[in-house]
UniProtKB/Swiss-Prot annotation:
Protein name: Putative ankyrin repeat protein L120
Gene3D superfamilies assigned to the protein according to its UniProt record, in alphabetical order: Ankyrin repeat-containing domain
Organism: Acanthamoeba polyphaga mimivirus
SUPFAM superfamilies assigned to the protein according to its UniProt record, in alphabetical order: Ankyrin repeat (SSF48403)
Annotated ANK repeat ranges: 119-146, 147-176, 178-206, 275-307
Length: 339
C-alpha cells in the first residue's frame, strides 16, 4: 500500500452503470423527449437510448416534476424487464429521498418485477455512494445485501457518519480490506468516523503512523471547515499517544507546501522538529536552487529581505503560472488564506 492515500485509493464506482462511458444525452435530445406525446413512438425512442442516457433522461424528468413521464415508462416496459427497472431505480436514488413520490414509483416497479438485488446489488451500492440512508433501509427491507462486494456499501459511506454507523450496527466489518475504512476516514479527515472506528478497536497507530501521515499528506487542505476537521483529527491522534516522529522529511515538506500555519502550529506543539529539513541543503556539493541565488543577489544589492521574498517567491510564481497556465495561483506563501 502507498505511504498515504490518494483519491483513487478509496473512490469506487457508485454503480456498474457508471462504468458505461457512452456520451451523455444532449439538451436537444432532452428537449425532444420533453415535448413528445407519451405514446408508442416515445417508448420506441426511449428504448433505443444507451442505458446511461436512459438514466439521465429519467433523472431530468424527476427534477422537472414530470412524474407522469416516469409512470408512463414504467407501465409500458415489458413485464419483469429488470434492466430497465433497475435503471429507473438508479435515477430515483439520485434525485429523490424516500417520500410518497418515491414510495409510489418504487412499489409500482416492485409490482412489475423490480429486483433490488439486480446486477450484484447495484442499487444499494448506488444509494451508499449518495449516502441516502432512507433509501438504503428501504432497499434492505426488500432484500438488498449490505455485504455485497466485500462490504462495499460500508466503504462508500465513510464520508457520512450517520450512514457509516448504520452499516456497522447492521453487521458490516470495520476491518474489511486491511482496515480500509479508517484509512479512508483519515484521508478525508472525517473525525467522527475515525474516532468511532478507533473506539471499536481499530489501531490509531496502524502501520507505524499511517493515519497521521495520511492526514498530513492529504491533498484536501483548503476550506476552513476542512482545516478545522483536519486539526481535530491530528489532536485526537496525538492525544492517543501517536508519536510525531513517524513523520519524515517527505511529510514535513508537504506541510510547508500546504502553507497552512494552523497545521504547522499543531505539529510543532506536538513535538515535530522542522529543523531536520536543514539536512536537505547541507550537502555542499549540491548547487543552491535558482530562487536562493536570486534572493541572495537581491539582498546583497540593497533590496530588503521581506521585499525580496515577496518578489521571488510570490510575484514570480504568479508570473510563471500565468505564463504556463494562463491564470494566477490561488494561494501563495505571502498570501495564505487560512493561517
Amino acid at each position: 500500500m502507498n505511504s498515504y492515500m490518494t483519491s483513487s485509493d478509496f473512490v469506487e464506482p457508485r454503480s456498474e452503470l457508471e462504468l458505461n462511458f457512452s456520451s451523455w444525452i444532449s439538451e436537444n435530445e432532452i428537449n425532444r423527449f420533453r415535448d413528445m406525446t407519451l405514446d408508442d413512438n416515445f417508448m420506441n425512442l426511449f428504448f433505443e437510448l444507451p442505458d446511461t442516457q436512459k438514466k439521465q433522461l429519467c433523472g431530468r424528468f424527476l427534477l422537472e416534476n414530470r412524474k407522469d413521464n416516469i409512470v408512463f415508462i414504467i407501465e409500458n416496459i415489458t413485464h419483469n424487464n429488470k434492466n430497465i427497472l433497475n435503471i429507473i431505480l438508479l435515477a430515483l436514488i439520485e434525485e429523490l429521498e424516500v417520500d410518497n413520490e418515491f414510495d409510489d414509483l418504487f412499489i409500482l416497479m416492485i409490482n412489475l418485477g423490480l429486483d433490488v438485488t439486480y446486477n450484484d446489488n447495484e442499487a444499494i451500492v448506488h444509494a451508499s455512494f449518495f449516502c441516502k440512508l432512507s433509501i438504503i433501509t428501504k432497499l434492505i427491507e426488500y432484500g438488498a445485501d449490505i455485504h455485497v462486494k466485500n462490504d462495499l456499501p460500508l466503504r462508500l459511506s465513510v464520508q457520512k457518519f450517520e450512514v457509516f454507523k448504520f452499516f456497522v450496527e447492521n453487521g458490516a466489518d470495520i476491518h474489511v480490506n486491511n482496515d480500509y475504512c479508517i484509512r479512508a476516514a483519515a484521508y478525508l479527515s472525517n473525525y467522527d468516523v475515525m474516532k468511532y472506528l478507533i473506539e471499536f478497536g481499530c489501531d490509531p497507530n496502524i502501520d507505524n503512523g499511517y493515519l497521521l501521515k495520511t492526514i498530513v499528506n492529504s491533498e484536501n487542505v483548503f476550506g476552513k471547515m476542512f482545516v478545522a476537521s483536519m486539526t481535530q483529527c491530528l489532536d485526537y491522534l496525538f492525544g492517543l499517544g501517536v508519536k510525531a516522529d513517524c513523520l519524515g522529511i517527505f511529510e514535513l515538506k508537504n506541510c510547508i507546501k500546504k502553507q497552512n500555519f494552523l497545521l504547522l502550529d499543531v505539529l510543532t506543539m506536538n513535538g515535530v522538529d522542522f529543523s531536520v529539513l536543514n539536512q536537505l541543503y547541507e550537502n555542499s556539493e549540491v548547487d543552491m536552487c535558482h530562487e536562493v541565488k536570486l534572493i541572495n543577489y537581491l539582498v546583497s544589492n540593497g533590496v530588503n529581505y521581506e521585499s525580496t521574498v515577496r518578489l521571488v517567491i510570490s510575484d514570480m510564481r504568479s508570473f510563471q503560472d500565468n505564463f504556463i497556465n494562463g491564470q494566477s495561483p490561488s494561494f501563495t506563501i505571502c498570501n495564505t488564506n487560512y493561517q
